[in-house]
From Swiss-Prot:
Homodimer. The tRNA molecule binds across the dimer. Disulfide bonds: none annotated. InterPro entries: aa-tRNA-synt_IIb (IPR002314), aa-tRNA-synth_II (IPR006195), aa-tRNA-synth_II/BPL/LPL (IPR045864), Ser-tRNA-ligase_type_1 (IPR002317), Ser-tRNA-synth_1_N (IPR015866), SerRS_1_N_sf (IPR042103), SerRS_core (IPR033729), tRNA-bd_arm (IPR010978). This is Serine--tRNA ligase. The lineage of its organism: Bacteria, Pseudomonadati, Pseudomonadota, Alphaproteobacteria, Caulobacterales. It is found in: Cytoplasm. GO terms for cellular component: cytoplasm. NCBIfam families: serS. Pathway: Aminoacyl-tRNA biosynthesis; selenocysteinyl-tRNA(Sec) biosynthesis; L-seryl-tRNA(Sec) from L-serine and tRNA(Sec): step 1/1. Its main location: cytoplasm. The gene is serS. CDD domains: SerRS_core. PROSITE patterns: AA_TRNA_LIGASE_II.
Length: 426
């Protein structure tokens, strides 16, 4: 959600940002609705003042035993009550229209975010690691199916497309990855582990900017609740409607959960393998900060996500997204892209975003400093630390040998005692 006062004061900034996102002319529409709302509020306040004054005079007339005047004033108050109801409806209608328009408009990028239309305009910040020399690398699906440990056909029979069944050593490797990530983020990076609900209500989905714009990308139950597309939703919602002590910030939460996405806009993209699934596991990172802390916390979060790839010795690059490629709620976003030998390119494995106070305004999450009056909105940040399925894909492809065996990364061997490879002798 946006601060209407900021839009009034710097309309050009908002118009430029929204036009770049394909929503030109919205500022004029917002200011028109804002003017109508303020006019309705002024008229309502005037009518309330007139009613209060008339009610006061009724008492005075009765005290003076002027029944005729009292009767006239009472009739006038009744007329004002009807006018107040009508004016109140005008105010509600204008307010709802303004809120609905603001709710559908994306966040404003930070000043340092580069201009650009799409992923081709993103800026590479750094690279880590060198891709291994692998002769004729196989893709992860071919490797998994050859071992008999990755079954897309069985998944399709029971669930349809974009699902997978992992078995045996591969299921164990996937579990080890998730546990390793969670241990790293909690034991070394100071995140508090949370086991959150996988179903959330409209308020939680709205507060984390998934509703109303992205309803078609979510799965909804028959009772109206939503399966989480990411643990960002319940983790950030821990502060929904709350006032937290500034002295306790930053708050850092992490969770390993299944995530559910309809992939409504992904027709024809990544149809083979595990890159784009309706259900997948992910370790999520969420931070709640003061406005002054959020920029540094963002850089820290990116480092926490990068640490997973470094420990696994997977080559990757870190990209600063341009304005046109950022998500709806993001003020600034870094993507981590891991090297996939079969595709001979880097693919997204994590996205770390600073939303500023965009989500906090939607969910009314505030902070208060001890000894001071008033509150202010917190800043919220979220990132993948990492997507477990895509990390499994990267491990399979980067650690394959010519015989189709997969070496287990050193960082994962404590989670798989006695094993050094998958697909052959231990």
């Amino acid at each position: 959600m946006h601060d209407i006062r900021a839009i009034r004061e710097t309309p050009e900034l908002y118009e430029k940002a929204w036009a770049a996102k394909g929503s030109p002319g919205k500022v004029a529409e917002i200011l028109k609705l804002d003017e109508a709302l303020r006019a309705a509020q002024t008229a309502l306040q005037a009518a309330q003042a007139e009613r209060n004054e008339a009610s006061k005079k009724i008492g005075q007339a009765k005290a003076q035993k002027d029944e005729a005047e009292a009767t006239r004033l009472m009739a006038h108050v009744e007329t004002l009550k009807k006018a107040l109801e009508e004016q109140g409806e005008v105010e509600r209608s204008a307010g709802e229209a303004l809120r609905a328009l603001l709710a559908g408009l994306p966040n404003i990028p930070a000043a340092e975010v580069p201009d650009g239309a799409d992923e081709h305009d993103n800026v590479e910040v750094r690279r880590w690691g060198e891709p291994r020399a692998i002769a004729a690398p196989k893709d992860h699906a071919t490797l998994g199916e050859a071992m008999g440990l990755m079954d897309f056909e069985a998944a399709a029979r029971m669930s349809g497309a974009r699902f997978v069944v992992l078995k045996g050593q591969l299921a164990r490797l996937e579990r080890a990855l998730g546990q390793f990530m969670l241990d790293l983020q909690t034991q070394e990076h100071g995140y508090t582990e949370v086991n959150p609900p996988l179903l959330v209500n409209d308020a939680a989905a709205y507060g984390t900017d998934k509703l109303p714009k992205f309803a078609e990308d979510l799965f909804q139950t028959t009772d109206g609740r939503w399966l989480i597309p990411t643990a960002e939703v319940p983790l950030t919602s821990l502060v929904m409607g709350q006032i937290v002590a500034e002295e306790e910030l930053p708050l850092r939460y992490t969770a390993l959960t299944p995530c559910f996405r309809s992939e409504a806009g992904a027709s024809g993209r990544d149809t083979r393998g595990m890159i784009r699934q309706h259900q997948f596991n992910k370790v999520e990172l969420v931070s709640i900060t003061t406005p002054e802390q959020s920029a540094d916390e963002h850089e820290r979060m990116v480092g926490c996500a990068e640490a997973v790839l470094k420990r696994l010795e997977l080559p990757f690059r870190t990209m600063l997204l341009c304005r046109g490629d950022m998500g709806f709620g993001a003020r600034k976003t870094y993507d981590l892209e891991v090297w996939l030998p079969s595709q001979e390119k880097y693919r997204e494995i994590s996205s770390c975003s600073n939303t500023g106070d965009f989500q906090a305004r939607r969910m009314d999450a505030r902070a208060k400093k001890a000894g001071e009056k008033g509150t202010r909105y917190v800043h919220t940040l979220n990132g993948s630390g990492l997507a477990v399925g895509r990390t499994l894909v990267a491990v399979l492809e980067n650690y394959q040998d010519e015989g189709g065996r997969i070496a287990i990364p050193e960082a994962l061997r404590p989670y798989m005692p006695g094993m050094t490879h998958i697909g052959g002798a231990a």
